[in-house]
UniProtKB/Swiss-Prot annotation:
Domain of life of the organism encoding this protein: Eukaryota
Subcellular location: Secreted, Cell wall
Organism of origin: Perkinsus olseni (Perkinsus atlanticus)
Protein name, as recorded: Wall protein 1
Alphabetic keyword roster: Cell wall, Cell wall biogenesis/degradation, Secreted
Main location: secreted
Length: 8
């Protein structure tokens, strides 16, 4: 998967 920067 691609890392968008959304780290809940």
């Amino acid at each position: 998967m691609e890392d968008e920067g959304a780290g809940g």
